[in-house]
C-alpha cells in the first residue's frame, strides 16, 4: 500500500482524536514516504491559512515539531511544506514566521541512518538556511520579494534611491542563500529533493526579476546620485554581475532535470563598456568635484533634484522623465575622465570583449543615454517576457579565464568619503510612500560603524553574524530561550552593518590591469529591438567580487521594520531577557507581564513563557499577541491535586503511619509525618523518642515547585495569616489525617472533605466523660516517659501553657467557614502576634489555640513532646489555654465562629491529679 510507517499513522490518529485537522494534515504531508508532500494535503493547508479561525502559530509549531524528527525524509518534507505555505499560503503565515526569533535550527542536522541520509542532510541544512533567510528578509522589508509586483511599474523600479540602496543587499543575501543550495542533476534522485528544487527554482525566477528591476532602477538614477550613493550602487552592480553567473548555472541544472525550457529565462549579458562608464562617472565625482553637476547632467543632491527623479506614481517609470538631461554632455565629460579610469585596474573580471579599443571605437558614434538603454532592457524578467526570451542567445561565461572563485576576493578598505551616503542621504520627496517606516534611519545615538566584511557567497547571512542586530529596542531581540540556536543559524542575531562609514570595497586586485586604449569610453549602442535590449539588461557576467549582499550599502541600524505592520511596543525588548533562575516570583506583578495586548493564544504561565514573555509580537491583523515560542511544555500550569498529600488513614486503630505521609506526600515542609492520633489510644507519642531529629522546627518551608507553583495562597504568602500551618492537621472528628493548605498555597485535594458534624461531635468527645478522661490520663501518662528527652531537643521558648485546669473540650460546631479567625478569647499573654513570636512552621501557635512561643508561661515538661510533631494537631489529652477552642477545620486559620459553650465539668480538673 503506501509507505507510511506505523509512527505516521499513530501521529495522525492522535491529532484526529484531539480534533486538530490542521495538525493531522501536517502529519500526513510529512510522513516517512520518500516522495514529495501530497498535493491534497498541501492544498488543505493552504486553504487553512486563509481561514480566519485557524491558529497559524499552531500550524507552524506542528511543522517545527516535525522538523525535529530524526529521519531526513520527515525533516525535508516539513521544510518543503513550510516553503510551500510561505509561497502559496496566506501572507499571515510568513508574517508569523518573520516574527519568530528562530525558525529552523538545523545547521547541525545529520541523519546517520544510511548513506542517503548523509547526502540529504547536506541539502536539509542548506534549505533550512534559505527558509530562515527568506523569513528574515520579510522582517526587514515588510514584504516578500517573490510576491511584489515586477516590471516597469513594479516595486523595485519605482523605489527611491535611498531605499533601493538598503533593499538590494537584503535581496542579494536571499538570492545568495538560495544559490547555496547548489544541487547537481545527479543528486536530484528522489521526490522530496525534487519538490524542494522546484520551489527554489520558482523562487529564483521571481527574486532575480526583482533583482533585475532594482539594478535597472539604480542605473537609471546613477548619474543623479551623490558620490557615496554612486559608490554603493556600483558595488551592487558588480555583485549583480557575479550573481548572474551563478544564476545561469542554477538555471542550467533546471534545464538538465527536465524543466520546460519555456519556463527558464535566457540571461544575456550587458556590454562591458557600461561598467567602464559607471566607473568613469564615479571617478569624475571623486576627482573633479567642481564639474560634478555638469558631468552628471543633473543636480547632485537628491533633495534638490527635479521631481522627475522621484516619481511616486506607479504608472510612470522614472526613466521616461530622466531622459531630459543631455546624454552627449554626460559622456563628453566622461571622455575627459578617460585617463583617470585608465590608471585604475579594470573592475571587469569577466569581460568577454578583450578588444576594448575596437569595441569602443565602433560604439562611439551613436551614444544613447544609459538611462534610456536601461529602460529598454529593463523588462528582461518581467512576468510576460520570461517565455519569449528563450530565443535570445546567451554568451557562454565559462570560457572566461578570469571567472571569480566562490571565495571572497581580496578586499581593501577605501577610506573614501562613502559616509556621505549615510549622513547626507535625504529622502527625495516627502510625499513618497515609505515602505520601510524608519527602518533604515540611523538612530541619533548610533555612530557610523565599519561595514564588516564582504562575506563569501557560500555564506547566506548578509553580513557577519557577529553583528548584534538585536541591540536597542528591537522587538524581535532574541531572548535567553533562543540561545540554543547556533550563531550562524540564530536567524535574527545578524543584521546589515549600521552605516557605511568606511566602505569595504572589493577591488579587482585579482585581475591584471587592462588599460583603456581608446579615449572614447562611450558604451556600445543599445538598439531598441528586444534581443539587443535584453542583452543590455542582464548585464555581463563581469564580476569584480563575489562578496555577499550587505557590505557597501548604507545598511540599517537596529531596526524596527514592523513598527507599523505588526505594531510592536518598543518596550517589549526590556522584558525579553529576564533572569533564568528557577526561583519564580509568583506574586510579582511583572513576572509574567508584557505590554498591553490582546489575548494570548497559549497560557503564559509556564516557566518558558516567563522567560520569553517580553519577546512577544503583536499582529495587527487580528489584534492578538503572538508569543515567540509556542512549543514550550507548560510543566507548571496544572499541578495535580492528588499529589498534595497521601490519602488520609481511616483505620480506627491507633497505629501510626510514621513514614507514609512524611515521604510520600509532596508537602511544603520536610517535617515528620502526620500522625493518626486516636482518642482511645496511647500511641500519640511514638515519635517522641526520635527527639530533635524529627522535631527540629523548620522556619522556612521547602516549596516543591511541581505542586504549588501557580496556585498561590495569597494570604499565607503576604503574611495575613499566621505562618503556623502545617501540611497536615489532626482532625479531632475521626482519627483522620486531613491535609491543610500549606503556606505556599498547594491546593487541597478532593479527599479533604470534612466529616459530618454529627460524627465529629460523637467521635471527638467519645461516648461519655469517662472515656474522655481515660484518654487524657493515658496520653499524658505515656508521654511522660520520654518527655525529658524531647524537652532537651526543643527550644525553651517554644513552651506552651497547658494543664488540666486549663483544658476545655468544646462541642464540635455544626458548621464552619473558611478563613474566619477564632472567636475564642486569647489570653493576654498571647497578644504577641505570630510574626513577632516567630513560631516555626511545625510549631503549634495561636492558630491551634496555643499562645505563640516566647510568652513566658509555665508548662508541664511533657507538653513539648506532644507538640513536637509539626504536622499533627494537639490530641485531646493536651490542654488548651482557657478561652480558646480546638478547631475542627481543615486549616488552622479557619476557626469556628461559634461562641464558646458553657463551662465544662472537666475544666476544674488539674493535671497534677493524674501524675
From Swiss-Prot:
Modified residues (Omega-N-methylarginine): 873
Record flagged with keyword Transport: yes
Basic and acidic residues bias: start-end ranges: 901-915
Biased composition (Polar residues): 302-324, 884-896
Residues carrying Phosphoserine: 296, 300, 306, 313, 594, 600, 640, 646, 775
Segments of skewed composition (Low complexity): 410-425, 500-511, 720-735
Gene Ontology BP, a term: vesicle budding from membrane
One Pfam family recorded for the sequence: ANTH
Compartments (UniProt record): Cell membrane; Membrane, Coated pit
PROSITE patterns: ENTH (PS50942)
Keyword annotations of the record: Cell membrane, Coated pit, Glycoprotein, Membrane, Methylation, Phosphoprotein, Protein transport, Transport
ENTH domain mapped to chain residues: 14-145
Record-listed Asymmetric dimethylarginine modification sites: 873
Primary localization class, coarse: membrane
Residues recorded with modification Phosphothreonine: 317
Membrane topology listed for this record: Peripheral membrane protein
Span list, region Disordered: 285-326, 391-425, 497-522, 720-765, 817-855, 875-915
Glycosylation sites (chain numbering): 310
Compositionally biased intervals (Pro residues): 512-522
Similarity comment text for this entry: Belongs to the PICALM/SNAP91 family.
Comment on protein domains: Possesses a three domain structure: the N-terminal 300 residues harbor a clathrin binding site, an acidic middle domain 450 residues, interrupted by an Ala-rich segment, and the C-terminal domain (166 residues).
Subunit structure: Binds AP2A2. Interacts with AP2B1; clathrin competes with SNAP91.
Protein known as: Clathrin coat assembly protein AP180
UniProt source species: Rattus norvegicus (Rat)
